[in-house]
UniProtKB/Swiss-Prot annotation:
HAMAP family associated with the record: MinE (MF_00262)
Designated name of the protein: Cell division topological specificity factor
Family: Belongs to the MinE family.
GO biological-process terms attached to the record: cell division; regulation of division septum assembly
NCBIfam families the UniProt entry points to: minE (TIGR01215), PRK00296.1 (NF001422)
Name of the gene encoding the protein in the UniProt record: minE
Keyword Signal attributed: no
A Pfam family: MinE
Record key words, sorted: Cell cycle, Cell division
UniProt xrefs under InterPro entries: MinE, MinE_sf
Signal peptide limits: none
Role played: Prevents the cell division inhibition by proteins MinC and MinD at internal division sites while permitting inhibition at polar sites. This ensures cell division at the proper site by restricting the formation of a division septum at the midpoint of the long axis of the cell.
Organism listed in the record: Rhizobium rhizogenes (strain K84 / ATCC BAA-868) (Agrobacterium radiobacter)
């Protein structure tokens, strides 16, 4: 007779799954800040090829949840912006 059976069957899979989800969420959030910075710089470089803009008036935000990540970009382009040929 196994003594561990007296205490009931342990259900470690749900706990392990939850710990893994927390770990992945933490890794995604730490990588997310670097990713947002890189995306911001690349997006600004592309926009600046066509239009002159103030880099301080650009905001990039990344939101992550368990199913999807969204990237929100807010670029203020002045009405009198100089348009450049590509």
């Amino acid at each position: 007779m196994n003594i561990f059976r007296l205490f009931g069957k342990q259900r470690t899979a749900p706990a392990a799954r939850e710990r893994l989800q927390l770990l992945l969420a933490h890794e995604r959030s730490s990588v997310g800040s670097d990713l947002v910075f890189l995306l911001r710089e690349e997006i600004l470089a592309v926009i600046e090829k066509h239009v002159q803009l103030d880099r301080d008036k650009v905001q990039v935000k990344m939101d992550c949840n368990e199913h999807v990540s969204t990237l929100e970009i807010d670029v203020e382009i002045p009405l009198n912006a100089t348009v450049r040929a590509a």
